[in-house]
């Protein structure tokens, strides 16, 4: 994960979430994305997180910090973020975009039921390098009873 890209999302959105997951290490999130960050050192508390993210104190003052402890990767904020989940559906990228509230969103279609899922491609920027260099990236959708979530996995 490219930490500087995550920091840019935090500064832009004013929100930083750190989840300590017992069976999976540290995850970093924004209001609309969450990233596995197991390559980072264990960090607890605002001061350690700010230091690891290398954010100036003045910029950090504008960020809402949320820290959580979760029991399993299968239930982070009620979502199963394990490598594979029963019932996940493959998707295909479409040449369609939409701009709800002025934010351009890319589109993927579920291969099973044809449902369209719009998401902000910019939220994948911390993973862009890994996505580009990976031989195997699979985009799937998982439904948890609420709204769909799109995942990319290597």
Predicted regions located by residue number:
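DNA polymerase processivity clamps
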Residues: 1-154
